[in-house]
Regions:
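Active-site helix-to-loop segments that bind/position phosphate- or nucleotide-bearing substrates
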Residues: 2-238
Length: 238
């Protein structure tokens, strides 16, 4: 029933617009919250400029009805958010050249790319567990070439789970820049010798309850959020 209802909802432009707006809004709120937390922890008041800009973009988003324009606002906010990393990572020994996917142009991007690959798996498992079709989404293109719903719902978890985790391991010096090597084909990647350490740190983090996630562990939070999406935004929408 979930799959049939999912197809009906995703074919309805009005519902698709509502889901896209709500998802991007939550992503922008997550970006602001993480920057505010880091600003407080590391005493970096200059981050307030970035959080204020993202807040302004969020206000524009709430007046928008066109999904393509919403994606554009999401992109502007993402650039602002990642520009803040140069402030956060100053004097840490980690260089930041701006967000780059594949190939990763610096070592922090290598950590982000690796972390998001783990998040993709977590999100896909949560979606399959709710009997939704991971290929049918509302924000990313439904062209059959990738699991659109996985990438749509991942947007809810990047900042509060993966970015937070990566900032933690950098601050605690649990992984050093020396553990990341340059590869001709893929840019910067994690050295094989550190992957076991990464997995240990990641699994420990994913199972630990966090106050910022309503007292749930990150893994539990993902599953709960996707389950609620299936029930509230698909089965009972409209």
């Amino acid at each position: 029933y979930q799959c049939k209802r999912q197809i009906e909802v995703m074919d309805e432009k009005n519902y698709q617009t509502i889901l896209a707006q709500n998802t991007i809004k939550e992503k922008l709120l997550n970006q602001r919250q993480l920057l505010k937390n880091i600003s407080k922890q590391k005493k970096l008041p200059s981050l307030n400029t970035y959080t204020h800009t993202i807040k302004t973009i969020t206000k524009s988003l709430m007046h928008e009805k066109n999904v393509d324009t919403m994606r554009g606002l999401e992109g502007i906010a993402a650039k602002e958010y990642f520009d803040a990393f140069k402030v956060i990572l100053a004097n840490t020994g980690w260089n930041w050249l701006g967000r780059s996917r594949r190939p990763a142009k610096d070592k922090v991007n290598a950590l982000l790319n690796y972390g998001y690959a783990f998040l993709e798996r977590e999100t896909r498992l949560a979606i399959v567990a709710t009997n939704l079709d991971p290929r049918i989404g509302f924000l990313h293109c439904n062209n059959g070439k990738k699991d659109s719903l996985v990438f749509d719902l991942m947007e809810l978890f990047r900042q509060p789970i993966i970015d937070r985790f990566i900032m933690n391991i950098i601050n605690r010096k649990q992984i050093s820049p020396d553990h990341i090597k340059k590869n001709k084909q893929y840019g910067y990647i994690l050295d094989e010798t550190i992957k076991a350490t990464w997995i240990h740190l990641y699994e420990s983090y994913m199972e630990k309850p966090l106050q910022s996630l309503e007292g749930m562990s990150p893994r539990e939070y993902i599953r709960n959020k996707v389950k609620n999406f299936s029930y509230n935004d698909i089965v009972n929408i409209g």
